[in-house]
Every structure is written in structure tokens, then in C-alpha cells.
């Protein structure tokens, strides 16, 4: 498995480093730090002065970046796998996505920036862009890392299931994990049919969803995972959070 571990020196970035102890040995592990060096925005400044300031800032950030990568490398678990360090200049999101394409990565690991919902909507977080646009699986770490023993895997449909099975075939975890596969059937009372007929229709749809999620769980059990399926009716976000709470208790 080819992994890109993107770091920026934040607390969540270091938590992303810590989660590597729970991932399997990488075929290739790339430590990536992207430098977004802004040029001075002062029109009245002489071009040569602005360029000198830019070069000084860039050199300082490069030195800080190299120290960060060395620090991260020293924190990796012994089983992390062959590691290379990459320090690149450019937009963090574009740089990470470009490297994922370039290296044909199987997984991108990084920490969330923690902008908050308002700033994230206005500016767009790096992690959100990676999650949306990455050509491979992504693992976004938001908060202190705990041992990875149970995984809740919500699936919306066949394309989700195929992507999940494809990734899990890589055996990405260092130790055995228990998988709970979940599908949520959003349901509102239709104008027709009504009463007992509507209830029967909902029951039939839930049975089909249960069969579907169990069939995916069976595929994962066939490749060595402990897996079971859960199908429920309700609002997806609410039901997923409730299931996560149940698994933690």
C-alpha cells in the first residue's frame, strides 16, 4: 500500500502521525509538507525589495519544513515501511492531490485544520478538498487518536461498497479490526400507499437493505475480516452518529 502522510505541524497533523502505528506497513510512505509562500502585497514596494523579502521568507519556511519532516520521521512506528521526505512549494491541497496522482497512492493521511464550520464554508479547508477530490482513499484525523479496534463503515450504495471492499483488500490495518457496515434508509410517510400498506412497503425496503448490507459483510468476512451489517430507517447523519455512540459504549 502506497501512503502519503501530509503534515503541517498542527496538533491534528501530529495525531495523523500517531495513527500510523495502527496502519499496516507501507510499500512506500511519503512524508509531504507543502509550503504556501505568499509574496508581499505592497504595490509601493520596489520589485527587487519584494523579491528579496520573498526569498528570505521562502528560505526560512524551507528550513522550518525540513525540521518538521525530520521530526515526523522520528515519530513513525518501526513498522511504517520505506520512507521518503518531500518538501514542495505550492497550494497544500493542489500539492497533495498532485503527488497522489503522481505516485498512484492508495491512501492519503492528514490532520484536519479545525477551521470551524463558518470559515470552512467560506474558505474551504484543505482536508475537505482532499476528501472531495482525492483519486484514492483518505484518512482525515480530527482530534486525539485512540487504538483502532472498531470501524463504522456507512455505505450509501453499490459504488460505496465496491470502493470499500477494494481498499480493505489491501489489508490496511496493523492489527485486526471489527467492521460494522451500515446503511440508512431515509423514509418519510408517502401520500400513497398509507396505513398498513405504507408500513409493509417500508418493511420490504428495509429487508432488501438488510440483505444488501449483509452481502457486503459476507464479502469482507471471506477475505478475513470480522464484519456484520446494520440496516436502519431514519435520517442518515443522525442514525450514523447514534450507531457510533452505541459502538463506543
Question: Residues of each region from the PLM?
Answer:
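A short acidic, glycine-rich active-site loop
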Residues: 51-67, 199-211
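Gly/Ser-rich helix-loop-strand patches that form or flank binding pockets
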Residues: 12, 22, 93-146, 241-249
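Fold-core signature of tandem repeat domains
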Residues: 68-69, 165
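Aromatic/hydrophobic pocket-lining residues that form π-stacking "cages" and hydrophobic walls in ligand
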Residues: 20, 72, 96, 130, ...
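Small/aliphatic-rich secondary-structure junction motif
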Residues: 1-52, 150-199, 219-221, 225-230
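Structural beta-alpha unit
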Residues: 39, 55, 59, 63, ...
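Short, conserved clusters of charged catalytic residues that mark active-site
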Residues: 15, 91, 125, 163, ...
Amino acid at each position: 500500500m502506497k501512503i502519503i502522510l501530509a503534515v503541517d505541524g498542527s496538533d491534528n497533523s501530529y495525531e495523523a502521525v500517531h495513527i500510523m502505528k495502527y496502519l499496516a506497513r507501507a510499500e512506500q510512505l511519503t512524508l509531504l509538507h507543502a509550503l504556501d509562500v505568499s509574496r508581499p502585497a505592497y504595490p509601493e514596494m520596489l520589485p527587487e525589495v519584494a523579491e528579496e523579502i520573498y526569498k528570505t521568507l521562502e528560505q526560512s519556511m524551507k528550513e522550518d519544513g525540513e525540521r518538521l519532516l525530520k521530526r515526523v520521521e522520528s515519530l513513525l512506528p518501526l513498522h511504517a515501511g520505506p520512507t521518503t521526505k518531500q518538501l514542495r512549494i505550492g497550494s497544500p491541497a493542489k500539492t497533495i492531490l498532485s503527488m497522489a496522482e503522481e505516485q498512484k497512492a492508495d491512501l492519503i493521511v492528514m490532520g484536519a485544520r479545525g477551521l470551524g464550520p463558518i470559515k470552512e464554508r467560506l474558505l474551504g479547508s484543505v482536508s475537505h478538498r482532499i476528501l472531495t477530490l482525492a483519486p484514492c482513499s483518505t484518512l482525515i484525523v480530527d482530534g486525539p487518536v485512540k487504538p483502532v479496534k472498531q470501524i463504522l463503515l456507512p455505505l450509501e450504495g453499490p459504488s460505496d461498497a465496491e470502493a470499500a471492499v477494494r481498499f480493505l483488500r489491501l489489508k490496511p490495518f496493523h492489527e485486526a479490526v471489527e467492521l460494522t457496515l451500515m446503511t440508512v434508509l431515509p423514509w418519510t410517510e408517502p401520500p400513497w400507499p398509507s396505513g398498513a400498506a405504507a408500513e409493509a412497503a417500508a418493511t420490504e425496503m428495509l429487508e432488501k437493505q438488510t440483505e444488501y448490507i449483509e452481502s457486503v459483510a459476507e464479502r469482507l468476512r471471506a477475505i478475513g475480516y470480522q464484519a456484520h451489517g446494520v440496516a436502519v430507517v431514519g435520517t442518515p447523519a443522525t442514525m450514523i452518529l447514534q450507531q457510533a455512540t452505541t459502538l463506543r459504549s
